[in-house]
Regions:
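Catalytic histidine neighborhood in serine/cysteine hydrolases
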Residues: 192-209
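Alpha/beta-hydrolase active-site loop
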Residues: 94-114, 133
């Protein structure tokens, strides 16, 4: 998958949190480069966001990841982002989604040590598949958000046989022109997931939540709105 240009200036965000570099997050492959958007001391949850495939330039600075972070941070939650093994300054080598699941678990362990509160997970594309696999069934994770969940990508196997064990509330958001998530295939994947669950289609959006020829302009704000609305309904965040 080729990523849309995704680098954003970190300090342009409008959320009240501060951004801190994390130096003590380590997985089986070594140190993982990470950023924490700090939250309120009394925040009921912490949040973790995972990035898309590095072969297309995916990092924790990806636009979709950044906007998901903003949605979560708007409720005062501390939000952790990190680069998978072999990406940016993270040690190790890319492992096609296998070792990356251990990276997610290492991030959950770090959050458990530092926050002592339940976690909400969000991931985009490759990051959604890897993160859902790692988080499903983990009692520390109380909510799951899959953004641009990939169900058809040439040369990669994105299977979802694990979904039946994902019993916590789930939100899936895809563009109705997602080139890696055809509607009929994505709806079949969604059917495998148990309730509670919600699937939202963003009209005129592609895989990266950018616009189409018939509906130009990025749809990232719409994606953010859907995340916020769901968090308010499911978790009572305000």
């Amino acid at each position: 998958m080729t990523q849309a240009p995704d680098k954003l200036e970190e300090m342009t965000q409008t959320t009240p949190s501060q951004i801190r570099s994390i130096d003590d997050l380590r997985g089986p492959a070594g140190r993982l480069e990470a950023l924490l958007n700090t939250g309120r001391d009394d925040a009921p949850y912490a949040a973790l966001v995972c990035h898309p495939h590095p072969s297309g330039g995916g990092t924790m600075h990806n636009k979709v990841v950044y906007h998901a972070m903003k949605a979560l941070s708007s409720f005062g939650l501390p939000v952790l982002r990190f680069n998978f093994r072999g990406v940016g300054l993270s040690e190790g080598e890319h492992d096609e989604g296998f070792g990356e699941q251990d990276d997610v678990k290492a991030a959950l362990n770090w959050m458990e040590r530092n926050f002592h509160r339940p976690v909400l997970f969000a991931g985009f594309s490759f990051g959604s598949n890897v993160g859902l696999r790692a988080c499903c069934g983990d009692p520390r994770v109380k909510g799951l958000i899959g953004l641009g969940v990939p169900v058809r990508a040439e040369g990669r196997d994105y299977s979802y046989g694990f979904l039946p064990k994902c019993t916590v509330p789930k939100l899936f958001i895809s563009g109705d022109h997602d080139q890696y998530g055809p509607r009929n295939v994505m709806e079949g994947v969604f059917e495998r997931a148990p309730e509670p669950k919600r699937l939202v289609w963003i009209a005129g959006a592609d895989h990266f939540f950018q616009g189409t020829a018939d509906s130009p302009g990025a749809k990232l704000d719409l994606m953010q709105q859907e995340i916020r609305s769901w968090l308010q309904r499911e978790f009572g965040l305000s």
